A protein has these predicted regions:
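Transmembrane alpha-helices and adjacent helix-loop boundaries
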Residues: 1-225
């Protein structure tokens, strides 16, 4: 059903889609903050001279990179209440932030690791010899230089994170994808619903991608001077 009436019905109920869009936006922001914190933390651990820290970081990265995000949603939202006799029950919003944040935190950790390792090791050694702690050397010397290297893959991860928020629909989160699926199934208007959802996701992802490209170009100009 793709005639004018289907689009009329879609725009009449657009408020539902917009609320789902706002939920998706809030979810993306929360997940991104968690993913960045975890990514920087485990990315730095991956380059530590202490084997135990590298091993722990590797376990985190390998586990989340090699298990499907949908499975992680099911385990956290449905599994934890069952194994804890319903003493651990995480709300849908926080479940989504936790799962998406952990999942992309593992990928961002690899991006951070590759960026750190691209910086000559002598810079860290020089910083430590000047009295910097490992953390302060990372924060003030290594990571700022690594940023221009990791910007393109980091931008890709942010875009993927936004798109992967749609997986919260599996636990009936009121995000854009869940609203789209529910509304289209109820009304039989699949094309307007999913085309509208695609445009709304595009309105989130495209500006991020463009911003990343502009930042990358600005960095290239700055370092070429």
């Amino acid at each position: 059903m793709t005639d004018l009436s289907s689009w009329t019905a879609y725009f009449q109920d657009f408020g539902q889609f917009f609320n789902g869009f706002l939920f998706t936006l809030a979810l993306a922001i929360g997940s991104f903050i968690l993913a960045m914190v975890l990514g920087i933390f485990f990315g730095a651990m991956s380059t530590s001279k202490r084997p135990i820290l590298r091993i722990l970081a590797r376990i985190f990265v390998e586990f989340y990179q090699n298990t499907p995000l949908l499975v992680q949603f099911v385990i956290v939202f449905y599994g934890l209440p069952l194994i804890s006799d319903h003493t651990i029950m995480i709300p849908i919003y926080w479940t989504a932030i936790l799962c998406v944040g952990l999942y992309h935190g593992a990928y961002i950790a690899e991006v951070i690791r590759s960026g750190i390792q691209s910086i000559p090791s002598g810079q860290m050694e020089a910083a430590l010899s000047q009295g910097f702690t490992y953390i302060s050397a990372m924060r003030l010397i290594i990571l700022p230089q690594a940023f221009r290297i990791i910007l393109p893959p980091l931008t890709n991860q942010i875009v993927n994170l936004i798109k992967n928020t749609s997986t919260v629909a599996i636990i009936s989160g009121v995000d854009l994808m869940f609203v789209t699926k529910s509304w289209s199934a109820l009304n039989g208007n699949y094309i307007p619903a999913f085309l509208g959802a695609a445009l709304l996701y595009f309105s989130l992802c495209f500006p991020v991608a463009q911003f990343g490209r502009k930042m990358e170009q600005a960095n290239k100009k700055a370092y070429s001077l």
